UniProtKB/Swiss-Prot annotation:
Its cofactor is Mg(2+). It is found in: Plastid, Chloroplast. This is Ribulose bisphosphate carboxylase large chain. The gene is rbcL. Heterohexadecamer of 8 large chains and 8 small chains; disulfide-linked. The disulfide link is formed within the large subunit homodimers. InterPro entries: RuBisCO, RuBisCo_large_chain_AS, RuBisCO_lsu_C, RuBisCO_lsu_C_sf, RuBisCO_lsu_fd_N, RuBisCO_lsu_N_sf, RuBisCO_lsuI. It comes from Drosera filiformis.
Amino acid sequence: GVGFKAGVKDYKLTYYTPEYQTLDTDILAAFRVTPQPGVPPEEAGAAVAAESSTGTWTTVWTDGLTSLDRYKGRCYHIEPVSGEENQFIAYVAYPLDLFEEGSVTNMFTSIVGNVFGFKALRALRLEDLRIPTSYIKTFQGPPHGIQVERDKLNKYGRPLLGCTIKPKLGLSAKNYGRAVYECLRGGLDFTKDDENVNSQPFMRWRDRFLFCAEALYKAQAETGEIKGHYLNATAGTCEEMIKRAVFARELGVPIVMHDYLTGGFTANTSLAHYCRDNGLLLHIHRAMHAVLDRQKNHGIHFRVLAKALRMSGGDHIHSGTVVGKLEGERDITLGFVDLLRDDFIEKDRSRGIYFTQPWVSLPGVLPVASGGIHVWHMPALTEIFGDDSVLQFGGGTLGHPWGNPPGAAANRVALEACVQARNQGQDLAREGNEIIRRAAKWSPELSSACEVWKEIKFIFEAMDTL
């Protein structure tokens, strides 16, 4: 005989190990597993562990040349999901040696590379990862982080204000630069390239970079405040992306931008290293995230993509607005917002946090709230996100009836009023609309904005949907 037992394997014999004690160096994953009818949860959980680590579908003789026990993933715990029939959370532990140091790309290729097409599963979703500190220490992380950014910009004690320049496609570079200048001059801290503004026939990247740099220097000189515009360096090749970042650095601007999911983690990590080495802040847009994270039972939850971004590197990341969205999102959104900002986050299933995660001093990332928000949302946003955030009003600035500078001024007045009210002990949740109305009395720009957009009902109680 050949000295080993040939044939197709029963995964749970090898990969389901409920007695396993997880190691501090293991990467832990929580998967939401929906097995095919007739497949027991232990077999499904074990199949996930096998297929995302050392397993293959049949016994191979080269298994004898390695130590499976040292390298295999293990499904160490399975629990049913309450309220769902035939859905389970399977916890899998991976030995650290399965992963290349400092590579988010390799981590994802291993953990989610193959297993999502597995026949024994009807659906699979990666809900959370626990990254061991020994692995985190192999990553640079964000180029600068929250504190360094505040020091660079000299802005403290309040959220930062931004605005995406619209219409996002079709403006010439000169007109685009004009809109940037007007918004910054009116009181915003940042303006932003849209995620799909790269280098198109109507506006090549170099022209846009030049006119935007001119705009922000002019606004800076006139306001005495440091200004920034997120210059989108995303490109078709890594070389071209770095070329654009180099040009931004030569212009002396403070910040560039990248679409990290469409651009890819390898490109993103390269750009983050360049940004730290050259003093550029890095704004991250999450275009394509909903392709991965929108389905409740299949895909990857955004908190995992957020964790991965903190490892790969970025100083800002878009993370939803909470207001005006579905109920139940508030606690879960704040779960991954804190995961981005804080140095340590405690396991809390009510917020979707499956594992306690220490970040061992990796810099934090500022969450960016953007999309469909306006001056009436300001108290809610200030209350929910706190000071360490970027609030972005695209239409909420450029849609002002008097033009861009008054639109920017209205947002700045609303923000300063909310911060002042909060610091004086007022309850933003209950008195929010009143605070905005009072501020509008001495700001015609805000008063006009208040008439265009409607007051919102700010209801805190959320139906959690874990």
